[in-house]
């Protein structure tokens, strides 16, 4: 199974944007890795017999919890355990309806729906996302307003 030609670890979202734009211009396939919990190996191997790169988002892991507004801004490389810990630092009663494995990356967990033990009462983790900043396939950085209400 082909391995990546290189691994790119961005420190901010503009670095992700640059990586996507460069990959498109150079016609290099890429995989995105958030936490690495991937039973199929889709984030670190490729069935395409061409060089590819991994955009590893593990260094994008800032978490800002705002208890007054019942919100948090979580970067994609943070793990669920880090999110739970940051919430617990601010409140003994707040939670986030997500999975039970603390080492799962937030990005992969939410894009997979975000199943967890609280989802029957509070919905999936993805149901609780009210805004996001994403880099699309063309390298554009989009937020909720730019993506439109179809995504949310």
For each predicted feature, which ranges?
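Short, basic, glycine/proline-bearing loop/turn elements
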Residues: 1-9, 135
């Amino acid at each position: 199974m082909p391995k990546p030609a290189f691994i790119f670890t961005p420190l901010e979202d503009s670095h992700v944007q640059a990586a996507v734009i460069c990959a498109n211009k150079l016609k290099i396939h890429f995989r995105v890795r958030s936490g690495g919990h991937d039973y199929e190996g889709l984030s670190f191997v490729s069935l395409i017999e061409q060089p590819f790169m991994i955009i590893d988002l593990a260094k994008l892991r800032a978490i800002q919890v705002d208890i007054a507004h019942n919100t948090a801004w979580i970067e994609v490389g943070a793990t669920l355990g880090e999110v739970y810990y940051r919430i617990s630092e601010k409140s003994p009663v707040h939670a986030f309806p997500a999975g039970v494995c603390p080492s799962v990356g937030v990005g992969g967990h939410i894009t997979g729906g975000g199943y967890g033990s609280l989802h029957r009462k509070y919905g999936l983790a993805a149901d609780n996302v009210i805004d996001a900043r994403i880099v699309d396939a063309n390298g554009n950085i989009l937020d909720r307003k730019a993506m439109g209400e179809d995504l949310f």
